[in-house]
Regions:
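Conserved serine/cysteine hydrolase catalytic core
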Residues: 1-75, 80-83
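Catalytic active-site module of serine/aspartate enzymes centered on a nucleophile-bearing elbow/loop
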Residues: 76-107
């Protein structure tokens, strides 16, 4: 993450309002967000634009959920992407690779 980013993160997780916001985001994922996803699936709604999926290869995402591209193909027809050699914090740990992938996708 880098010393500067780690210091900012450490300060943020000691701010009760930041922690509350983080927990509310997780709570929404189990509640209202999940309700909206079920409604979208029931209605047959899908992502109608090209979708780029990037993920860290030094994280447990694939172990927990399987292939991210396969998962997102349930939600969109035009899915591309790949793993980046990074831990959980892709923007901080692999900024060049992330920038390249985004630039190629948006070109």
């Amino acid at each position: 993450m880098g010393e500067h980013n780690h210091a900012e993160w450490r300060a943020a997780v000691h701010d009760p309002e930041v922690v509350r916001g983080m927990l509310e985001d997780y709570r929404a994922g189990l509640g209202i967000d999940a309700d909206h996803e079920r409604a979208d699936r029931t209605a047959g709604r899908r992502v109608q634009r090209p979708l780029l999926v990037l993920w860290s290869t030094r994280d447990d995402l694939e172990d927990l959920y399987g292939d991210p591209l396969t998962i997102w193909r349930d939600w969109a027809d035009d899915v591309t992407g790949h793993g980046l050699d990074s831990g959980h914090h892709i923007a901080e740990q692999a900024p060049e690779d992330l920038t390249t992938a985004l630039g190629e996708f948006l070109a």
